[in-house]
Amino acid sequence: MRNDPFQRLGLDREVLTVSQLNQRARLLLEDVFPQVWVEGELSNLARPASGHVYFTLKDSNAQIRCALFRQNALRVRQALRDGLAVKVRGKISLFEGRGDYQLIADTVEPAGDGALRLAFEALKEKLAGEGLFASERKRPLPAHPRRIGIVSSPSGAVIRDIISVFRRRAPQVELTLVPTAVQGREAVAQIVRALQLADRQGFDALILARGGGSLEDLWCFNEEAVARAVAACATPIVSAVGHETDVSISDFVADVRAPTPSAAAELLAPNAGDLQQRLDGLRRRLVLRMRDQLLRERLRLEGVARRLRHPGERLRQQAQRLDDLDMRLRRAFERQLAVRHERLVRLETRLAAQHPGRTLALLRQKLDSLAARLPRAAREVLKDRRQRLEGLAQTLNVVSPLATLGRGYSILLDERGRAIRDAGQTQPGQRLKARLAEGELEVRVEDNHRTPVTLSLLD
């Protein structure tokens, strides 16, 4: 015979087991509350494979766990979701295994939109009206960040997932965790302070991250204070709150929304293929620039050669200028090669961390070969121009008056240094200078016959 649940314990201090206590409590609750209607807001909705539905029904001050078994869940037409306001009919009971007080529901009816959803939509409309969601405000993420701040909880899988992605894709990126609570009463204030602190550290980008959870668990990211802190950040920020189906106010305000924290890391981790493509582009630009510079210098040297019209000092000046151009061109090549080589070394270091392997080695060999060939080509061109100049100098020397003097001829000059070309330009007794190949003679005109003189071609 079953004990009366309302029977008080005797004065002899009857001792109950935990199972007996929970059983009596369950019978008492089911007897007093065989059927009740309760209105509240759904949260922590769970649908296991059994077909049963478990959820929490709450208002602003309290909450109760509820169970809707499969045969009753099939009759519910309304799609249940977190934040939905409903009216639930059922009996109050107690799950003896855990001692949990609960409502066994048999009917669930909608009671209008939940308070959290209404608050979400109201804040979303307000901030959108202020332009905080506008695309013009969105800043692009850096293509190759060096330092990234992560605003998240220091414990849990989120930070481990983010670190794992960066170790795999971009181990050279420096990650800094700015710890904060992401759930609970203190979460909003801590998140705001963490964002303000991170924004002052000079990071290239920020990740605001949290794992999945119920609407209540994620609610701090729907608070106005957090949204305005995100909007105030001068640093580009990626919001990665919850799972792919979760959407928060911070997602709308941030520069980029990522469906998961791992996806946020993928967005900011440089891709090895992009770096390889950039290296190829730099190599092509280097080759084209060197060719262009070599062509300009060659044209310049040709112009110098065309302007060489006079012997002697003019020729020496141009030869000196050619030497100067040679040295400047060499220095320019060496300087450009040093700058490009240093830049390539930096890129190679970054690529080496991502194991590009044999492709990078082959590219480096090819680039070294090009770098070695360019100076040799420049030296060959300069050598050819120098030989042409020497040939011109020899030609000019052949037709030079000084060469004529060297064959035994002389040049007569009057007192003013003017050359005497005709005997009629002189007077008997006039003193003249005779310039020879080596030295000068003082001579005097004895007579000035204007008889034509025939010179031997063999002289």
UniProtKB/Swiss-Prot annotation:
Which top-rank group of organisms is this from? Answer: Bacteria
Which cell locations does it reside in?
Cytoplasm
- Its EC number is 3.1.11.6
Q: Which residues form a coiled coil?
A: none
Pfam families reported for this sequence: Exonuc_VII_L, tRNA_anti_2
Q: What enzyme class is recorded for this protein?
A: hydrolase
Gene Ontology CC terms, in alphabetical order: cytoplasm; exodeoxyribonuclease VII complex
Q: Name one GO molecular function term.
A: nucleic acid binding
Keywords in UniProt for this one?
Cytoplasm, Exonuclease, Hydrolase, Nuclease
Q: Does the keyword Nuclease apply?
A: yes
An example Gene Ontology biological process: DNA catabolic process
Reactions that this protein is recorded to catalyse: Exonucleolytic cleavage in either 5'- to 3'- or 3'- to 5'-direction to yield nucleoside 5'-phosphates
- Recorded family membership: Belongs to the XseA family.
Oligomeric form and interacting partners: Heterooligomer composed of large and small subunits.
Q: What does this protein do?
A: Bidirectionally degrades single-stranded DNA into large acid-insoluble oligonucleotides, which are then degraded further into small acid-soluble oligonucleotides.
What is this protein's name? Exodeoxyribonuclease 7 large subunit
